[in-house]
Amino acid sequence: MACNSPALAAALLCGAFLALPLHSQPLHAQTRPDPAADRLAFQAYFKSRFPKLPLAEFANGPYAVNAEMRKQWESINEFPPYDFALEEGKLAFETPFANGKTYGDCFPDQGIGIRQNYPAFDQATGEVVTLDLAINRCRERNGEKPLPYQTGPMASIAAYMAETSRGKPFAIEIPDDARALEAYEDGKRFFYSRRGQLNFSCASCHVEAAGQRMRGDILAPALGILASFPLYRSDWGGMGTIDRRLTACSAQVRSVPFAPQDRAYRNLEYFLSYMSNGVPIAGPGTRP
């Protein structure tokens, strides 16, 4: 991400976030990460960039920063195109597995109203667990085959679980565990690192160019960017998960995508979700 933007410089994002090594180092070789300070700076930047926008509105992505698109979005949401996915997801969520158990048996509070707590760091395995990964691990523990991650039943089940959490703010925790801090730093590094033939980073579009138009689309701010997933996108003609969108982003910058639920993507989701703590869940959502 270029650091020639006065607004970015004022928010100290370039200095604070880009002073990162290109390759991972043990935490003892670096200044100890401070995710809370990062989050305050991250949110302060977007609040200064869009001073009239309440924090909760960032959940609505491009519709929060473009009045014309918002009118179209409000019209579409009179008959949400994701309703079919909610119905399918609820049915799948409540249908018992062959052993008689359900998805609810795998999650706190029977899986209702918990989307805002994911991704979570699993101290037993030392890795980040996204909601989608937790759904498939639940299936496997109960003798079922895992679902494909990008669309289909996975998107529908995740959509239903998100809908039960609608309005609850992200509440991602980063425990005082060196492995959790390394996962957070890895996700942060991914977000700010340039890649692909176009030499773009995630931040190039969703920090520096947030709210601007590119190829006919309004670029959503990074703050709250995951709050509305899974999404119904017009260009997909159907539902898609975070993995589907990350794969598409990689293709757009002409970079080789990672496999769905690769550690790199999970850590990126961990970073972005933690940066969005306080932004309410608004999924499932719609996008152009």
What residue ranges belong to the model's regions?
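Electron-transfer interface patches adjacent to heme c in soluble/periplasmic c-type cytochromes
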Residues: 30-84, 95-156, 163-167, 173, ...
